[in-house]
Protein backbone atom coordinates (compact mmCIF):
# COMPACT_ATOMS: atom_id res chain seq x y z
CA UNK A 1 0.00 0.00 0.00
CA UNK A 2 2.86 2.37 0.81
CA UNK A 3 4.38 1.82 -2.65
CA UNK A 4 1.14 2.73 -4.41
CA UNK A 5 0.62 5.79 -2.20
CA UNK A 6 4.05 7.07 -3.23
CA UNK A 7 3.29 6.17 -6.84
CA UNK A 8 0.02 8.12 -6.85
CA UNK A 9 1.66 11.17 -5.29
CA UNK A 10 4.44 11.23 -7.89
CA UNK A 11 2.09 11.03 -10.85
CA UNK A 12 0.07 13.96 -9.51
CA UNK A 13 3.22 15.90 -8.54
CA UNK A 14 4.88 15.68 -11.96
CA UNK A 15 1.63 16.50 -13.75
CA UNK A 16 0.58 19.66 -11.88
CA UNK A 17 3.89 21.57 -11.81
CA UNK A 18 3.58 24.82 -13.76
CA UNK A 19 5.50 25.18 -17.00
CA UNK A 20 7.00 28.43 -18.19
CA UNK A 21 9.90 27.80 -20.57
CA UNK A 22 9.53 27.52 -24.32
CA UNK A 23 9.66 23.94 -25.56
CA UNK A 24 11.76 23.24 -28.65
CA UNK A 25 10.12 21.40 -31.54
CA UNK A 26 12.68 18.61 -31.34
CA UNK A 27 14.83 17.50 -28.45
CA UNK A 28 17.64 17.16 -31.02
CA UNK A 29 17.81 20.93 -31.36
CA UNK A 30 20.66 21.39 -28.94
CA UNK A 31 23.31 24.09 -29.11
CA UNK A 32 26.95 24.25 -28.16
CA UNK A 33 27.10 26.63 -25.21
CA UNK A 34 30.77 27.43 -25.76
CA UNK A 35 30.00 29.29 -28.98
CA UNK A 36 28.13 31.99 -27.05
CA UNK A 37 31.12 32.84 -24.85
CA UNK A 38 32.83 36.13 -25.56
CA UNK A 39 36.44 35.84 -26.75
CA UNK A 40 39.33 36.38 -24.29
CA UNK A 41 37.06 35.91 -21.28
CA UNK A 42 37.92 34.13 -18.03
CA UNK A 43 34.92 32.77 -16.16
CA UNK A 44 34.29 30.83 -12.99
CA UNK A 45 31.79 28.11 -13.81
CA UNK A 46 29.84 26.04 -11.32
CA UNK A 47 27.87 22.95 -12.27
CA UNK A 48 26.00 21.36 -9.39
CA UNK A 49 23.41 18.61 -9.45
CA UNK A 50 21.89 18.00 -6.03
CA UNK A 51 19.68 14.96 -6.29
CA UNK A 52 17.48 12.52 -4.46
CA UNK A 53 16.62 9.31 -6.30
CA UNK A 54 14.47 6.50 -4.97
CA UNK A 55 14.29 3.23 -6.90
CA UNK A 56 11.44 1.07 -5.60
CA UNK A 57 12.25 -2.11 -7.51
CA UNK A 58 10.40 -5.36 -6.99
CA UNK A 59 11.01 -8.90 -8.21
CA UNK A 60 14.14 -10.75 -9.24
CA UNK A 61 15.51 -8.43 -11.92
CA UNK A 62 17.47 -5.94 -9.83
CA UNK A 63 17.88 -4.43 -6.38
CA UNK A 64 16.11 -1.30 -5.24
CA UNK A 65 18.19 1.52 -3.76
CA UNK A 66 18.27 5.25 -3.04
CA UNK A 67 20.77 7.90 -4.12
CA UNK A 68 20.85 11.05 -1.94
CA UNK A 69 23.71 13.39 -2.72
CA UNK A 70 25.27 15.82 -5.18
CA UNK A 71 27.71 16.06 -8.08
CA UNK A 72 29.62 19.36 -7.87
CA UNK A 73 31.99 20.53 -10.61
CA UNK A 74 33.56 23.97 -10.10
CA UNK A 75 35.89 25.05 -12.91
CA UNK A 76 37.65 27.92 -14.64
CA UNK A 77 36.63 28.54 -18.25
CA UNK A 78 38.72 30.54 -20.72
CA UNK A 79 37.80 31.35 -24.32
CA UNK A 80 40.86 32.19 -26.41
CA UNK A 81 38.58 33.27 -29.26
CA UNK A 82 35.25 32.20 -30.72
CA UNK A 83 36.85 28.91 -31.84
CA UNK A 84 38.93 27.61 -28.94
CA UNK A 85 38.00 27.28 -25.27
CA UNK A 86 39.51 25.56 -22.23
CA UNK A 87 37.85 24.45 -19.01
CA UNK A 88 39.61 22.97 -15.97
CA UNK A 89 38.35 22.08 -12.52
CA UNK A 90 37.42 19.19 -10.29
CA UNK A 91 34.36 16.94 -10.13
CA UNK A 92 33.14 15.79 -6.72
CA UNK A 93 30.54 13.13 -5.97
CA UNK A 94 29.04 12.87 -2.50
CA UNK A 95 26.44 10.39 -1.32
CA UNK A 96 25.01 11.52 2.00
CA UNK A 97 25.88 8.96 4.65
CA UNK A 98 28.77 7.42 2.68
CA UNK A 99 32.30 7.81 4.04
CA UNK A 100 34.27 5.47 1.75
CA UNK A 101 34.32 5.46 -2.06
CA UNK A 102 36.01 2.86 -4.28
CA UNK A 103 38.38 4.33 -6.87
CA UNK A 104 36.63 2.94 -9.93
CA UNK A 105 34.50 4.42 -12.67
CA UNK A 106 30.94 4.69 -11.40
CA UNK A 107 29.43 2.82 -14.30
CA UNK A 108 28.33 -0.75 -14.83
CA UNK A 109 31.23 -3.11 -15.52
CA UNK A 110 30.50 -6.29 -13.55
CA UNK A 111 34.05 -7.69 -13.64
CA UNK A 112 35.77 -4.67 -12.13
CA UNK A 113 37.19 -4.87 -8.62
CA UNK A 114 38.29 -1.82 -6.65
CA UNK A 115 41.66 -1.93 -4.94
CA UNK A 116 41.93 1.68 -3.72
CA UNK A 117 39.52 3.89 -1.82
CA UNK A 118 38.91 7.57 -1.07
CA UNK A 119 37.38 8.90 2.13
CA UNK A 120 34.68 11.53 2.47
CA UNK A 121 34.05 12.26 -1.20
CA UNK A 122 34.74 10.76 -4.63
CA UNK A 123 36.91 13.34 -6.39
CA UNK A 124 38.45 13.42 -9.90
CA UNK A 125 39.99 16.16 -12.10
CA UNK A 126 37.87 17.77 -14.82
CA UNK A 127 39.28 19.17 -18.08
CA UNK A 128 37.79 20.01 -21.46
CA UNK A 129 39.32 21.59 -24.57
CA UNK A 130 36.85 22.49 -27.33
CA UNK A 131 37.26 23.57 -30.93
CA UNK A 132 34.15 25.13 -32.44
CA UNK A 133 34.89 24.38 -36.07
CA UNK A 134 31.70 26.20 -37.02
CA UNK A 135 28.50 27.19 -35.20
CA UNK A 136 27.18 23.70 -36.04
CA UNK A 137 30.30 21.56 -35.55
CA UNK A 138 32.33 21.00 -32.39
CA UNK A 139 35.30 18.80 -31.51
CA UNK A 140 36.18 18.32 -27.83
CA UNK A 141 38.96 16.57 -25.94
CA UNK A 142 38.89 15.64 -22.27
CA UNK A 143 35.59 15.45 -20.48
CA UNK A 144 32.54 14.79 -22.62
CA UNK A 145 29.18 16.55 -22.59
CA UNK A 146 26.40 14.05 -21.88
CA UNK A 147 23.88 16.40 -20.28
CA UNK A 148 21.25 15.19 -22.76
CA UNK A 149 22.10 11.47 -22.25
CA UNK A 150 23.50 11.56 -25.80
CA UNK A 151 19.84 11.46 -26.92
CA UNK A 152 19.99 7.66 -26.77
CA UNK A 153 16.72 5.71 -26.37
CA UNK A 154 15.85 4.82 -22.77
CA UNK A 155 16.69 1.09 -23.11
CA UNK A 156 20.28 2.02 -24.05
CA UNK A 157 21.05 4.72 -21.47
CA UNK A 158 20.09 4.97 -17.81
CA UNK A 159 19.15 8.51 -16.81
CA UNK A 160 21.13 8.08 -13.57
CA UNK A 161 24.45 8.25 -15.44
CA UNK A 162 23.89 11.95 -16.03
CA UNK A 163 24.26 12.91 -12.39
CA UNK A 164 25.80 9.94 -10.55
CA UNK A 165 28.39 8.37 -12.88
CA UNK A 166 31.78 9.95 -13.32
CA UNK A 167 31.97 12.46 -16.18
CA UNK A 168 32.83 10.70 -19.42
CA UNK A 169 36.29 11.54 -20.74
CA UNK A 170 37.99 11.09 -24.08
CA UNK A 171 37.02 12.61 -27.44
CA UNK A 172 33.66 13.91 -28.69
CA UNK A 173 32.53 15.14 -32.10
CA UNK A 174 29.14 16.82 -32.51
CA UNK A 175 27.30 18.12 -35.53
CA UNK A 176 24.00 19.96 -35.30
CA UNK A 177 22.40 21.09 -38.56
CA UNK A 178 18.75 21.66 -39.45
CA UNK A 179 18.31 18.13 -40.83
CA UNK A 180 21.25 16.24 -39.31
CA UNK A 181 22.38 15.63 -35.74
CA UNK A 182 25.48 13.61 -34.85
CA UNK A 183 27.02 12.87 -31.47
CA UNK A 184 30.06 10.59 -31.60
CA UNK A 185 32.22 10.00 -28.54
CA UNK A 186 34.95 7.79 -27.11
CA UNK A 187 34.88 7.42 -23.33
CA UNK A 188 38.23 6.02 -22.15
CA UNK A 189 37.43 4.50 -18.79
CA UNK A 190 40.52 2.54 -17.80
CA UNK A 191 44.13 3.25 -18.78
CA UNK A 192 46.70 0.51 -18.20
CA UNK A 193 50.41 0.56 -17.46
CA UNK A 194 52.82 -2.35 -17.83
CA UNK A 195 51.92 -5.26 -15.52
CA UNK A 196 48.74 -3.54 -14.42
CA UNK A 197 46.12 -5.57 -12.53
CA UNK A 198 43.07 -4.40 -14.48
CA UNK A 199 42.14 -4.21 -18.14
CA UNK A 200 42.03 -1.40 -20.67
CA UNK A 201 38.41 -0.34 -20.99
CA UNK A 202 36.57 2.11 -23.20
CA UNK A 203 33.11 2.84 -24.54
CA UNK A 204 32.43 4.08 -28.07
CA UNK A 205 29.11 5.70 -28.86
CA UNK A 206 27.39 7.19 -31.89
CA UNK A 207 23.97 8.78 -32.21
CA UNK A 208 23.04 9.93 -35.71
CA UNK A 209 19.64 11.45 -36.37
CA UNK A 210 18.20 12.50 -39.71
CA UNK A 211 15.28 14.95 -39.62
CA UNK A 212 12.85 15.61 -42.43
CA UNK A 213 10.22 18.36 -42.24
CA UNK A 214 7.15 16.98 -44.00
CA UNK A 215 5.11 20.06 -43.10
CA UNK A 216 7.31 22.87 -41.83
CA UNK A 217 6.90 23.49 -38.09
CA UNK A 218 4.04 20.99 -38.03
CA UNK A 219 5.03 17.49 -39.04
CA UNK A 220 8.52 16.01 -38.81
CA UNK A 221 10.00 12.58 -39.50
CA UNK A 222 12.99 11.57 -37.39
CA UNK A 223 15.21 8.57 -38.25
CA UNK A 224 17.67 7.78 -35.40
CA UNK A 225 20.56 5.31 -35.50
CA UNK A 226 22.51 4.58 -32.32
CA UNK A 227 25.57 2.50 -31.50
CA UNK A 228 27.17 1.73 -28.12
CA UNK A 229 30.30 -0.44 -27.96
CA UNK A 230 32.16 -1.48 -24.82
CA UNK A 231 35.59 -3.09 -24.96
CA UNK A 232 37.71 -4.91 -22.36
CA UNK A 233 41.28 -5.57 -23.50
CA UNK A 234 44.86 -4.53 -23.02
CA UNK A 235 48.31 -6.12 -23.26
CA UNK A 236 51.21 -6.82 -20.89
CA UNK A 237 48.92 -7.17 -17.87
CA UNK A 238 49.61 -8.90 -14.56
CA UNK A 239 47.01 -11.65 -14.83
CA UNK A 240 45.06 -13.75 -17.29
CA UNK A 241 42.32 -11.63 -18.87
CA UNK A 242 40.05 -12.31 -21.81
CA UNK A 243 39.53 -9.74 -24.56
CA UNK A 244 35.91 -9.06 -25.39
CA UNK A 245 33.72 -6.46 -27.08
CA UNK A 246 29.99 -5.94 -26.59
CA UNK A 247 27.76 -3.78 -28.75
CA UNK A 248 24.24 -2.36 -28.73
CA UNK A 249 22.66 -1.11 -31.95
CA UNK A 250 19.35 0.73 -32.20
CA UNK A 251 17.55 1.80 -35.36
CA UNK A 252 14.16 3.44 -35.41
CA UNK A 253 11.72 5.96 -36.77
CA UNK A 254 9.64 8.67 -35.11
CA UNK A 255 6.92 11.01 -36.33
CA UNK A 256 6.39 14.32 -34.49
CA UNK A 257 3.26 16.42 -34.88
CA UNK A 258 3.11 19.91 -33.40
CA UNK A 259 -0.18 21.62 -32.56
CA UNK A 260 0.32 24.94 -30.77
CA UNK A 261 2.43 24.03 -27.71
CA UNK A 262 1.60 20.33 -27.74
CA UNK A 263 3.86 17.87 -29.55
CA UNK A 264 2.60 14.34 -30.15
CA UNK A 265 5.06 11.66 -31.20
CA UNK A 266 4.79 8.04 -32.26
CA UNK A 267 7.78 5.85 -32.97
CA UNK A 268 9.56 2.54 -32.58
CA UNK A 269 13.12 1.28 -32.14
CA UNK A 270 14.64 -2.08 -32.95
CA UNK A 271 17.57 -2.96 -30.70
CA UNK A 272 20.29 -5.56 -31.18
CA UNK A 273 22.96 -6.92 -28.82
CA UNK A 274 26.14 -8.78 -29.74
CA UNK A 275 29.20 -10.17 -27.99
CA UNK A 276 32.49 -10.58 -29.88
CA UNK A 277 35.11 -12.65 -28.08
CA UNK A 278 35.05 -15.26 -25.35
CA UNK A 279 33.90 -14.05 -21.95
CA UNK A 280 31.65 -15.25 -19.15
CA UNK A 281 30.82 -11.72 -17.97
CA UNK A 282 27.60 -11.47 -19.97
CA UNK A 283 25.07 -14.28 -20.23
CA UNK A 284 24.28 -14.09 -23.95
CA UNK A 285 26.15 -13.83 -27.24
CA UNK A 286 23.41 -11.96 -29.07
CA UNK A 287 19.86 -10.80 -28.53
CA UNK A 288 17.19 -8.37 -29.67
CA UNK A 289 14.43 -6.08 -28.44
CA UNK A 290 11.62 -3.96 -29.89
CA UNK A 291 10.49 -0.68 -28.35
CA UNK A 292 7.34 0.98 -29.77
CA UNK A 293 6.14 4.13 -27.98
CA UNK A 294 4.02 7.24 -28.00
CA UNK A 295 5.02 10.51 -26.36
CA UNK A 296 3.23 13.73 -25.44
CA UNK A 297 5.19 16.90 -24.76
CA UNK A 298 3.82 20.22 -23.51
CA UNK A 299 6.55 22.81 -23.02
CA UNK A 300 8.87 21.26 -20.38
CA UNK A 301 6.60 18.34 -19.48
CA UNK A 302 7.01 15.04 -21.34
CA UNK A 303 5.16 11.76 -20.84
CA UNK A 304 6.09 8.59 -22.72
CA UNK A 305 4.14 5.33 -22.91
CA UNK A 306 6.06 2.35 -24.30
CA UNK A 307 6.03 -1.40 -24.74
CA UNK A 308 9.27 -3.38 -24.48
CA UNK A 309 9.73 -6.94 -25.77
CA UNK A 310 13.16 -8.61 -25.58
CA UNK A 311 14.98 -11.92 -25.86
CA UNK A 312 18.58 -12.58 -24.74
CA UNK A 313 19.15 -8.82 -24.65
CA UNK A 314 21.82 -7.00 -22.65
CA UNK A 315 21.70 -3.21 -22.29
CA UNK A 316 25.27 -2.01 -21.77
CA UNK A 317 24.46 1.42 -20.30
CA UNK A 318 20.73 1.07 -19.65
CA UNK A 319 18.68 0.04 -16.65
CA UNK A 320 18.79 -3.66 -15.65
CA UNK A 321 15.02 -3.67 -16.27
CA UNK A 322 15.83 -3.79 -19.99
CA UNK A 323 18.08 -6.86 -19.67
CA UNK A 324 17.15 -10.55 -19.87
CA UNK A 325 19.11 -11.51 -16.79
CA UNK A 326 18.97 -10.79 -13.08
CA UNK A 327 21.41 -8.55 -11.24
CA UNK A 328 20.19 -9.57 -7.78
CA UNK A 329 19.96 -13.37 -8.23
CA UNK A 330 23.18 -15.08 -9.43
CA UNK A 331 23.02 -17.02 -12.72
CA UNK A 332 19.32 -16.31 -13.27
CA UNK A 333 18.49 -15.63 -16.91
CA UNK A 334 15.04 -14.89 -18.28
CA UNK A 335 13.26 -16.19 -21.34
CA UNK A 336 11.70 -13.83 -23.83
CA UNK A 337 9.88 -11.23 -21.74
CA UNK A 338 7.86 -8.07 -22.18
CA UNK A 339 6.80 -5.11 -20.09
CA UNK A 340 5.04 -1.79 -20.21
CA UNK A 341 7.15 1.29 -19.54
CA UNK A 342 6.04 4.81 -18.56
CA UNK A 343 8.31 7.79 -18.16
CA UNK A 344 7.45 11.37 -17.18
CA UNK A 345 9.98 14.22 -17.02
CA UNK A 346 9.64 17.86 -16.11
CA UNK A 347 12.02 20.83 -15.87
CA UNK A 348 11.12 24.10 -14.15
CA UNK A 349 13.35 27.11 -14.87
CA UNK A 350 14.14 28.98 -11.65
CA UNK A 351 16.85 31.42 -12.72
CA UNK A 352 19.46 31.83 -15.42
CA UNK A 353 21.13 28.41 -15.56
CA UNK A 354 19.19 27.06 -12.57
CA UNK A 355 16.33 24.59 -12.80
CA UNK A 356 14.38 22.06 -10.78
CA UNK A 357 13.98 18.74 -12.59
CA UNK A 358 11.84 15.74 -11.77
CA UNK A 359 11.43 12.39 -13.44
CA UNK A 360 9.35 9.28 -12.85
CA UNK A 361 9.65 5.81 -14.36
CA UNK A 362 7.31 2.85 -14.11
CA UNK A 363 8.18 -0.70 -15.19
CA UNK A 364 5.23 -3.08 -15.40
CA UNK A 365 6.78 -6.50 -15.97
CA UNK A 366 4.39 -9.06 -17.42
CA UNK A 367 4.46 -12.82 -16.73
CA UNK A 368 8.11 -13.86 -16.42
CA UNK A 369 9.92 -17.20 -16.74
CA UNK A 370 13.59 -18.04 -16.45
CA UNK A 371 16.27 -20.58 -15.62
CA UNK A 372 18.85 -20.87 -12.88
CA UNK A 373 21.30 -23.80 -12.71
CA UNK A 374 20.43 -26.22 -9.91
CA UNK A 375 16.93 -24.81 -9.38
CA UNK A 376 13.47 -25.51 -10.76
CA UNK A 377 12.06 -23.44 -13.60
CA UNK A 378 11.49 -19.88 -12.42
CA UNK A 379 7.90 -18.75 -13.00
CA UNK A 380 6.76 -15.36 -11.75
CA UNK A 381 3.56 -13.39 -12.10
CA UNK A 382 3.75 -9.82 -13.30
CA UNK A 383 5.09 -7.17 -10.94
CA UNK A 384 5.48 -3.38 -10.90
CA UNK A 385 8.60 -1.37 -10.13
CA UNK A 386 9.05 2.37 -10.22
CA UNK A 387 11.66 5.03 -9.64
CA UNK A 388 11.64 8.78 -9.25
CA UNK A 389 14.21 11.49 -8.92
CA UNK A 390 14.29 15.19 -8.10
CA UNK A 391 17.32 17.24 -9.10
CA UNK A 392 18.26 20.84 -8.42
CA UNK A 393 20.51 21.93 -11.30
CA UNK A 394 22.79 24.93 -10.92
CA UNK A 395 24.75 25.67 -14.10
CA UNK A 396 26.05 29.21 -13.78
CA UNK A 397 29.07 31.24 -14.87
CA UNK A 398 30.60 34.40 -13.39
CA UNK A 399 32.83 36.66 -15.50
CA UNK A 400 36.14 37.14 -13.68
CA UNK A 401 38.09 39.08 -16.28
CA UNK A 402 37.90 40.09 -19.92
CA UNK A 403 41.32 40.39 -21.57
Question: Whereabouts are the PLM-identified features?
Answer:
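Bacterial Sec-dependent N-terminal signal peptides
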Residues: 1-31, 173, 382-403
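Exposed, low-structure sequence patches enriched in small/polar residues
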Residues: 3, 47-49, 69, 126, ...
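Transmembrane beta-strand segments of Gram-negative outer membrane beta-barrel proteins
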Residues: 30-56, 86
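Surface-exposed strand-loop-strand hairpins of Gram-negative outer-membrane beta-barrel proteins
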Residues: 47-71, 101-103, 115
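Flexible, solvent-exposed loop segments that connect beta-strands
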Residues: 57-61, 102-115, 154-156, 323-328, ...
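Surface-exposed extracellular loop regions of Gram-negative outer-membrane beta-barrel proteins
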Residues: 75-94, 174-185, 267-269
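Surface-exposed loop and membrane-interface regions of Gram-negative outer-membrane beta-barrel proteins
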Residues: 83-133, 154-155
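Surface-exposed coil loops of outer-membrane beta-barrel proteins
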Residues: 138-209
Amino acid sequence: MKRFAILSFLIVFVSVLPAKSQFCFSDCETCFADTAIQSHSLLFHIDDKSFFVDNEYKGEKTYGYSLPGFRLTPSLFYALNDKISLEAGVSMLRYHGANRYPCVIYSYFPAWQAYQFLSGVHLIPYFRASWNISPAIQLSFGNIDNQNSHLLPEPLYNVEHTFSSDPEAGVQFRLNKPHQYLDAWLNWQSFVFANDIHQETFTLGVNWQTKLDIVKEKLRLLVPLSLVVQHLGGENLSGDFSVCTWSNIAAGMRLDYKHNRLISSIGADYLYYNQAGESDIMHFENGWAVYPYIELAYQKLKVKFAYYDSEDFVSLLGSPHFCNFSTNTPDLVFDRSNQFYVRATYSYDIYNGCSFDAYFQLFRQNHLTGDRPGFDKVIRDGFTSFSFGIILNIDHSILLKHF
